[in-house]
Swiss-Prot record:
Cofactor: binding details: Binds 1 [4Fe-4S] cluster.
Keywords (A to Z) from UniProt: 4Fe-4S, Gluconeogenesis, Iron, Iron-sulfur, Lyase, Metal-binding
Pathway this chain belongs to: Carbohydrate biosynthesis; gluconeogenesis
Protein's UniProt name: Probable L-serine dehydratase, beta chain
Gene Ontology annotations of biological process type: gluconeogenesis
EC numbers for this chain: 4.3.1.17
Gene name tied to this protein: sdaAB
Keyword Iron: yes
């Protein structure tokens, strides 16, 4: 899911008329799928701003569903993603919201099954680039351009240092890191973008640290 050099300007190869409305939308959906870790049974997509005005004509709805099915931006199946999802028995609902977003190309995705639910807000900033701005009520800034680790934890002294020590042990270089929390001493979310894909055994070691609740990753 990484794009470099000229692709950062003109956008990746994509199915659809606009890199912001299709490639970016597909990547938002794919990040949600990656974090959820499995195919959802129910999908609710809420469109804001420009997305709300043009999502049907520009294929934004199709692109997001394609991403949620784990299709890449150049996958021809994106064109029929909604039909494919419905054939799988996935329940899909699109909503147009009146609220004025900070960025015009904004979508909120809620996906769920009998095991759980995930809510994610993403923006498409042009050229196929995206930012994830909210995850399950936590504010964050996640580009989707690099492998990332997301750590849900209790806001306790030494937790961040413990995670950093594990990453240093395996020579994992951190490109960007931030922490959001509900309140002092409550649930927190650590977002860590790194320079290489993370093996599962590293995630296992992170998950065994004190105060860690859940560890997930986004692969490159």
């Amino acid at each position: 899911m990484k794009y470099r050099s000229v692709f950062d300007i003109i956008g990746p190869v994509m199915i659809g008329p606009s890199s912001s409305h299709t490639a970016g939308a597909a990547r938002i959906g794919r990040v949600a799928r990656s974090l959820f870790g499995r195919e959802p049974e129910r999908i609710i997509v809420s469109f804001y701003g420009s997305f709300a005005e043009t999502y049907k004509g520009h294929g934004t709805d199709v692109a997001i569903i394609g991403g949620l099915l784990d299709f890449d931006t150049f996958d021809e199946r994106i064109k029929t993603a909604i039909q494919i999802a419905e054939a799988k028995g996935i329940d899909i609902e699109f909503r147009v919201e009146d609220a004025v977003p900070v960025h015009p190309n904004t979508a909120k995705i809620t996906i769920s099954d009998e095991k759980g639910e995930l809510e994610l807000t993403g923006i498409s900033i042009g050229g196929g680039k995206i930012e994830i701005t909210e995850l399950n009520g936590f504010e964050l800034r996640l580009s989707g351009n690099h492998p990332a680790i997301l750590v849900v934890h209790n806001d306790k002294f030494g937790t961040i240092a413990g995670v950093a020590n594990v990453l240093a042990k395996f020579s994992i270089n951190v490109g960007h890191m931030e922490v959001a929390r509900k309140d002092i001493g409550q649930l927190a979310l650590m977002t860590i973008e790194v320079d290489q894909n993370i093996d599962d055994h590293i995630l296992d070691e992170l998950s065994k640290l004190p105060n860690i609740i859940q560890v997930t990753k986004i692969a490159d």
